[in-house]
Amino acid sequence: HVEIFFDPQTHTDRGIKFDTVINGIYKALKKAEKEFGLSFKIIMCFLRHLDEELGFKILEQASLHKDKIFGVGLDSSEQGNPPSKFEKLFKKAEEKNFVTVAHAGEEGPPEYIWEALNLLNVKRVDHGVQCLNDDKLVKKLRDSQIPLTVCPLSNVKLQVFKKLEEHNLKKMLNEKLMVMVNSDDPAYFGGYLNQNLIETQAALNLSKEEVKTLLVNSFKSSFLNEEKKSKW
């Protein structure tokens, strides 16, 4: 099972039609489903360095492909672009029955995670590693078991941590947070899921039980329905 993000504004801004972007992605995923049994969900992200108003135009186009697009997210440059900038847009997305997620607390402060939870009503926080700098937030995340999609190789590439050995994933596990390992953008950040797991396990000396917990958490945190989750 895979839940992939795509940024349509990267392509529509250079003249490629929204329909062309989503139909190409969807066609490839359907082919993988048929050939490899790979189930999927598609999440469309808004680029946070752009104006919220531009997001409404993209959302309208996404609404025409609701049969393909499961949810909406928020990515790109985090610093100076808080989730609150997109509160109205995410409310509109929820009205259109899109599930909401958002990148928060990777390079940005814990306050961005609070905003993602309280203003964007996200069902999952992407990254979220800065949460350990806020005890109240840690308690909130522990009690609610809101998933955190941690991307270790990405964090190092962006210098959130200078090296993988300094990553706080093990501390997040010790806090009983609903964390898992993800790949972010493999082409940019140097590895798909397996590579992230292998390098992180070695760097942090994770036990077999800790690796198992990360994998189990990923299934729990997926947007698969309960029937399909139970098969795993």
In which residue ranges do the predicted regions lie?
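Short HxH-centered metal-ligating active-site micro-motif
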Residues: H103
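Metal-cofactor-binding active-site regions of metalloenzymes
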Residues: H1-F98, E107-E111, L119, K123-R124, ...
